[in-house]
């Protein structure tokens, strides 16, 4: 999940140079290159969306300086953009079914990591919205957990959220 435009420009430069090297050493003209995936989306509120225009401008500049002089123009460029196409458009709707008050405040949901694996598997961040309290102060700190008996079944750890009620 990369948000830095320079990452993609650096990747394109490496691939374009490889295309030129293959042509020079093997006499093979590459018809396309695949920049792969990784084009990110902001998961956290403080993250900024990657500028596609900036990424395209940087890649175009590198293309014009490497591919065109090497006689490989036109070179098709593919990109696997699954995350920006699908990532921002899914919602997991859950209900708080219990609370536990010990050394931390826990909120248990009727969902589990079988419904959304990324937080439990990689500790990835996903925004949590408390329905009807979108503009309320986030003055409570919760561990939001799933319904499996599994220590990694967590949606959020020590997350500032509005007060969550059961139901």
Language model segments and positions:
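Charged (often Lys/Glu-rich) extended helix/loop segments that serve as interaction or gating elements
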Residues: 58, 67-68, 72-166
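Active-site loop/helix belt of alpha/beta enzymes
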Residues: 1-100
């Amino acid at each position: 999940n990369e948000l830095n435009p320079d990452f993609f420009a650096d990747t394109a430069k490496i691939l374009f140079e490889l295309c030129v090297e293959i042509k020079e050493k093997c006499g093979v003209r590459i018809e396309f290159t695949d920049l792969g995936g990784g084009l990110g989306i902001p998961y956290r509120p403080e993250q900024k969306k990657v500028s596609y225009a900036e990424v395209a401008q940087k890649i175009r500049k590198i293309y014009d300086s490497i591919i065109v002089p090497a006689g490989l123009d036109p070179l098709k460029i593919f990109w696997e953009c699954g995350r920006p196409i699908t990532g921002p458009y899914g919602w997991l709707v859950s209900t708080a079914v219990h609370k536990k008050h010990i050394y931390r405040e826990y909120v248990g949901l009727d969902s589990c990591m079988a419904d959304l694996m990324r937080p439990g598997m990689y500790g990835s961040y996903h925004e949590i919205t408390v329905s009807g309290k979108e503009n309320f102060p986030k003055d409570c700190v919760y561990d939001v957990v799933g319904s499996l008996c599994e220590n990694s079944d967590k949606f959020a750890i020590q997350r500032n959220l509005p007060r969550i009620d059961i139901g």
